[in-house]
Amino acid sequence: MADAKSTIAKDVTELIGNTPLVYLNRVVDGCVARVAAKLEMMEPCSSVKDRIGYSMISDAENKGLITPGESVLIEPTSGNTGIGLAFIAAAKGYRLIICMPASMSLERRTILRAFGAELVLTDPARGMKGAVQKAEEIKAKTPNSYILQQFENPANPKIHYETTGPEIWRGSGGKIDALVSGIGTGGTVTGAGKYLKEQNPNIKLYGVEPVESAILSGGKPGPHKIQGIGAGFIPGVLDVNLLDEVIQVSSEESIETAKLLALKEGLLVGISSGAAAAAAIRIAKRPENAGKLIVAVFPSFGERYLSTVLFESVKRETENMVFEP
């Protein structure tokens, strides 16, 4: 009897991508369009940023810019890109220094340290700009160091053009009418959006940003609670000309929607997934979208947010529980 072909991955990097799509069923009352979620929480390290962690490191290696065991990698991040880099740095043997605003969840810090990354916290009042500046300072005094620069690095949207976009197109059987994606670096909406519009120019692209920091809508940067989107500046990798519309969602609505996704859909997701879902539901209620298919990208898994406002009430409740005799 012939041996069955082995499907064992050679290492953890081969597990990235090919995440599933699932319809939302119980949070879509009043919607005239169908809403499906692209579950990036099913990546090996539970976020969409696993894709760019891999693509940015591979790209720099292929260009001869970094070498495992020799180069020191540095990156400013709101957390998930740091984790996406950290598990690959661990698998390949890189030293990694992460600069992150102190306002990001405790889970992020713990996971980064578990992968052996060094962590430098920056002033939360200065947002991502403060983390970027700190990374530059560290690079200046660290020999053989390299900043991957997710906000400027073309390898970021490129991986979404090559993988995320085609996966959504195939997964929807070419039936997608609109893509909804929160904008952090803008890599997902730019790369996947460009691919999808090449397949069908009528596909609409919706970016999502916090109402409290609505830069893309001409507003001012400000503090908000939607970790991972709304960096407070327009990233270099974002192609704003691709966007058909930018939807603003408040931190409160994002948090409430994320809670509902757990309670009604069985999907434990992060706050930015709540923002994407809230925007997608809003779009799906517009009469002109009757019968259409809207795909929302859910960037990360809820377990990474247990220490945040998202789970504050249930956490308090569980901490105060006593056993029954």
UniProtKB/Swiss-Prot annotation:
* Gene Ontology CC entries for this record: cytoplasm
Q: Which reaction does it catalyse?
A: O-acetyl-L-serine + hydrogen sulfide = L-cysteine + acetate; pyrazole + O-acetyl-L-serine = 3-(pyrazol-1-yl)-L-alanine + acetate + H(+); pyrazole + L-serine = 3-(pyrazol-1-yl)-L-alanine + H2O; 3,4-dihydroxypyridine + O-acetyl-L-serine = 3-(3,4-dihydroxypyridin-1-yl)-L-alanine + acetate + H(+)
Using the UniProt record, give the first listed, main subcellular location. Answer: cytoplasm
Q: Which UniProt keywords apply?
A: Amino-acid biosynthesis, Cysteine biosynthesis, Cytoplasm, Lyase, Pyridoxal phosphate, Transferase
In the record, which positions carry N6-(pyridoxal phosphate)lysine? 49
Which GO terms fall under molecular function for this chain's record? Answer: beta-pyrazolylalanine synthase activity; cysteine synthase activity; L-mimosine synthase activity; pyrazolylalanine synthase activity
Task: Output the superkingdom of the source species.
Answer: Eukaryota
Record pathway? Amino-acid biosynthesis; L-cysteine biosynthesis; L-cysteine from L-serine: step 2/2
| Residues reported in the UniProt entry to bind pyridoxal 5'-phosphate | 80, 184-188, 272
Key word Transmembrane helix present in the record? no
Q: Which protein are we looking at?
A: Cysteine synthase
Q: Which organism is it from?
A: Citrullus lanatus (Watermelon)
